[in-house]
Amino acid sequence: MSDSYREQHKLRLAYMPWLYPRLKPRHRAWAEPWQKKVQEELERLETVRFGEHCFVAPQARLFAEPGRDIRVGDHSHIAADTVLHGPIRLGAHVSINHHATLEGGAAGIEIGDHSRIAAYATLYAFNHGREAGDLIREQPVTSRGIRIGRDVWLGARCGIVDGVTVGDHAVVAMGAVVTRDVPPWSVVAGNPARPIGRRPGAPPEEGGER
């Protein structure tokens, strides 16, 4: 394999990290040492810890000062041009696609196992005061945290504001702005996001028809 081909292959993986676990043995022979080096360097520079069989693009930006650590669960993937600022906890088999932004504020972001965060999604776990009479930049910052459940899909360019919990198995549509909690199995869309249905085959809602 030529050096130029390998570099192109690395770039493809950086933007499409779901291809990493599908690599053929001859590609895995160079990709695994490469990833080991990338992850060890991040762990040396920041308070970041990776589980087993993770992928992180060299172009990803992870910032985790002491007290704002980032934990990445087994088999999770972080694509290129993402920005993650702790505190953040990613479960196992979590995928963060390119250009997503996760800002943990003080209270942090937690994402459950098997959840998918699509390209350009934005999660901000803090908010500014906005009282009239004072400059916004001089007002206190608050942080309640963001909780994303298990098997959740956050669509491309959606936004999740501070204090929101997205329940297990929920779907947030492309471009939605989520300002309140999302029940499990719900599908929400719009700005502000509102329920538009439930995932096909979802169990009945509690208290609903049986």
Predicted regions: what is each one?
Residues 161, 171-177:
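A generic "structured core" feature
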Residues 34, 40-42, 52, 62-64, ...:
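Short, functionally important structural connectors and interaction interfaces within domains
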Residues 1-53, 114, 120-121, 125-133, ...:
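Terminal amphipathic alpha-helical/low-complexity segments used for targeting or macromolecular assembly
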